[in-house]
């Protein structure tokens, strides 16, 4: 019934909007847009004159594969990128790594507003399902990149711009379906420019999928609305967007034995009978979270050389994950953990219980950004500033227990609050030193104040009060021997604070990074190439240990010195009128230097070891055949080399190399009547049906009880299997 109502509403809206539209427009997915930049991102975006390594992804490129998978999966074929999916098929919880750096080190901004969670520093795209349908461009900067808003980039930064204003009215309906009972419905509309000054547009989306992993279902809803006023010198825009996700938990992974015999098995929600035998699974072992974003942007052209921008943001997030804790499976069942008093029943002391609990997050995030930009024929100057405040409440509630004594309903067994404030500003400039040489300088100061106070889920008291100030300078030169090519060199320093999990696990130090980039770009009519070398030197890097916490988040630790060296090549070559070839290569060496590890109770110097989750080879390729402007088909391939999930080079910690190919076909036509354009898209993922794992975890512990007086280090690993051959196909109607 829900789906039927959805279709009725969007069809009614589509015909109503079409009836009001009198202007004949070009029937393309990329409708005409105004030239005035809608959200001022000049200060944080890179251009061809910036000595930074970057790749731009357009709305048109995104739309070819946008059938319901998350943004990280849509960026999978970019240089040096590795993506992950807990549910195995790109819907639900997904992740991205760039140059071996995980998502907590990839700075993400939405219209210049930081999107990384202030405490965990992660990005959770599951909270914004189908956000790709509201994106006009994504810029991926590899390395430190330019100064940006939010925490410093330690591997990459991702600048996401939402949709431009449309000159003409339109509406569209898009439906896609595929393997694992995946179904996506999207309705979009725009009024176009009303009286040449006002515009209103929006999107509604639903995504449902059972996932590849058992019970790893996703039930996702999202919305995006924007209204704008613009004239020759002013653009004011207000945006409201957000999402609600309910996903059955699939972040536990499976061990090697289960992987070989039942790779889709999901241990989440296991329930056991009195004899210790598996009796079933808890049906509501879900993650349930809502995130709402409110943005206001004002961009003012002062004169032909100066412009000013102001951005305001409020984000509210609230939700929980619910779990059944079974005594037989070693769950969180003890009274000490649940903050309950033991009691006596007859002659038996009751001090543990099967239970159902919810662990909550309830947070508010306020941001203000300002920008002042000056541009002439020979120089540019950008000043940017940010102030943000985050308040996050963390608490756990007990919903049910078999033997909980006098505990009150929804008894809270932990409760704490994290508060993080940040103030930063940057000043950057480019100047044409000569006709062929452009200088670049970028200076940033960040101040961070982070506090945590209360009881965490150990239970134990956690008290953190940390104030940090960072100075991050950057500089470089671009040499342009001709109009179609450039050579650049840059140096960038980045420093940043630990995240919440780091503080919970000890007394972490801030990280420091010196990044050197040397690159060459050439852009001709039928060939574009970008090649670069990088040298990233870390001090006190918070490396992934390979272990994870109870919600699958990675655990990190400071190491002394570490290094990433690499070479990357990214090309687009028009082989013939109908053939386009887009290869990319990334070769790297990723090392801990002078690494120590305690094995069997003895501290050992392992010397140089591989950094966790850092493959030395990542290759991407796209070969596209377009016999006409209406049809194209392409094969996309990805090779990811062997990875270690820990930092001690243990063979038990490896993820095998894998080579995966997808087939993507798109057909468009214009009926030229009441439907302006129809677009059909299909993607067949993993066409060779490879069994592979793109993510996992590794842990060690010391066995001190099996042999008295002897310590034995035990290793363990878990894996996240990815789906074999599976497909998505969709139809989009533009009115």
Give residue ranges: language-model regions.
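A beta-strand signature from Gram-negative outer-membrane beta-barrel systems
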Residues: 129-172
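Extracytoplasmic beta-strand/coil segments of soluble accessory domains associated
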Residues: 72-114, 136
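Transmembrane beta-barrel wall of Gram-negative outer-membrane proteins
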Residues: 170, 177-208, 213-250, 296-304, ...
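Membrane-embedded beta-barrel scaffold of Gram-negative outer-membrane proteins
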Residues: 301, 307-313, 480, 486-492, ...
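C-terminal beta-signal and adjacent terminal beta-strands/loops
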Residues: 581, 589-591, 642-644, 668-735
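Short acidic/polar hinge/loop motifs at secondary-structure boundaries
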Residues: 114-142, 161, 258, 267, ...
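Short, acidic, small-residue-rich periplasmic hinge/interaction motif at the N-terminus
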Residues: 21-64, 103, 528, 532
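Gram-negative outer-membrane beta-barrel transporters
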Residues: 435, 535-537, 557-647
């Amino acid at each position: 019934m829900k789906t039927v109502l959805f279709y009725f509403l969007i069809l009614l809206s589509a015909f109503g909007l079409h009836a009001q539209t009198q202007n004949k427009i070009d029937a393309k997915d990329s409708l005409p847009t105004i030239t005035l930049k809608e959200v001022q991102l000049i200060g944080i975006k890179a251009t061809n004159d910036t000595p930074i390594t970057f790749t731009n992804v357009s709305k048109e490129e995104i739309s070819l594969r946008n059938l319901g998978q998350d943004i990280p999966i849509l960026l999978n074929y970019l240089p040096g990128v590795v993506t992950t999916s807990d549910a195995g098929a790109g819907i639900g919880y997904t992740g991205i790594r760039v140059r071996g750096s995980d998502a907590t080190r990839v700075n993400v901004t939405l219209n210049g507003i930081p999107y990384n969670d202030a405490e965990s520093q992660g990005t959770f795209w599951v909270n914004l399902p189908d956000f790709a349908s509201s994106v006009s461009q994504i810029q991926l900067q590899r390395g430190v990149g330019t100064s940006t808003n939010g925490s410093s980039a330690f591997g990459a930064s991702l600048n996401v711009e939402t949709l431009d204003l449309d000159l003409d009215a339109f509406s569209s309906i898009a439906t896609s379906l595929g393997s694992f009972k995946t179904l996506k419905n999207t309705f979009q509309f725009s009024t176009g420019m009303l009286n040449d000054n006002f515009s209103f547009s929006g999107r509604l989306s639903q995504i449902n999928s059972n996932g590849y992993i058992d019970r790893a279902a996703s039930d996702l809803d999202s919305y995006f609305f924007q209204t704008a006023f613009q004239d020759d010198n002013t653009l004011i825009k207000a945006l409201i967007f957000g999402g609600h996700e309910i996903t059955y938990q699939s972040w536990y992974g499976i061990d090697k034995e289960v992987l070989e015999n039942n790779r889709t098995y999901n241990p989440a929600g296991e329930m056991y009978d009195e004899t210790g035998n598996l009796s079933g699974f808890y049906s509501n072992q879900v993650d349930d979270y809502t995130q709402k974003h409110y943005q206001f942007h004002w961009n003012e052209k002062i004169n032909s050389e100066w412009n000013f921008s102001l951005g305001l943001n409020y984000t509210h997030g609230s939700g929980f994950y619910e779990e059944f804790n079974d005594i037989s499976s070693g769950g969180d069942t003890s009274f000490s953990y649940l903050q309950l008093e033991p009691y006596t029943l007859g002659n038996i002391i009751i001090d543990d219980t099967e239970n159902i609990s919810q662990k909550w997050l309830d947070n508010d995030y306020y941001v203000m950004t300002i920008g002042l930009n000056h541009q002439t024929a020979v120089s540019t100057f950008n000043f940017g500033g940010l102030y943000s405040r985050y308040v996050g409440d963390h608490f756990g509630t007990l919903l049910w227990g078999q033997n909980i004594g006098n505990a009150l309903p929804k008894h809270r067994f932990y409760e704490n609050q994290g508060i993080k404030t940040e103030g930063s500003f940057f000043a950057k400039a480019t100047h044409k030193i000569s006709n062929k040489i452009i200088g670049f300088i970028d200076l940033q100061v960040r101040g961070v104040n982070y506090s945590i106070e209360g009881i965490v889920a150990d239970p134990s008291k956690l008290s953190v009060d940390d104030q940090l100030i960072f100075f991050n300078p950057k500089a470089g030169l671009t040499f342009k021997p001709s109009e179609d090519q450039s050579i650049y060199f840059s140096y960038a320093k980045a420093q940043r604070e630990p995240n919440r999990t780091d503080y919970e696990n000890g007394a972490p130090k801030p990280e420091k990074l010196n990044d050197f980039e040397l690159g060459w770009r050439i852009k001709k009519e039928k060939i574009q190439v970008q090649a670069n070398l990088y040298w990233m030197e870390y001090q006190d890097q918070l490396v992934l240990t390979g272990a994870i916490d109870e919600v699958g988040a990675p655990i990190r630790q400071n190491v002394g010195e570490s290094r990433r060296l690499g070479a990357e090549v990214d090309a687009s070559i028009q082989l013939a009128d109908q053939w386009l070839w887009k290869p990319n290569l990334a070769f790297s060496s990723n090392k801990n230097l002078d690494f120590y590890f305690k094995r069997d109770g003895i501290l050992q110097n392992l010397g140089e070891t591989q950094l966790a989750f850092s493959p030395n080879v990542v290759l991407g390729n796209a070969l596209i055949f377009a016999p006409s402007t209406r049809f194209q088909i392409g094969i996309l391939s990805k090779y990811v080399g062997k990875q270690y999930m820990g930092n001690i080079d243990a063979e038990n910690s490896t993820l095998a190399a894998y080579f995966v190919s997808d087939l993507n076909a798109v057909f468009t036509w214009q009926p030229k009547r009441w439907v302006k354009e129809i677009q059909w898209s299909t993607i067949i993922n993993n066409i060779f049906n490879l069994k592979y794992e793109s993510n996992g975890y590794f842990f060690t512990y010391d066995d001190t009880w099996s042999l008295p007086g002897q310590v034995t280090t035990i290793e363990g690993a878990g894996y996240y299997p990815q789906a074999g051959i599976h497909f998505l196909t969709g139809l989009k109607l533009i009115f």
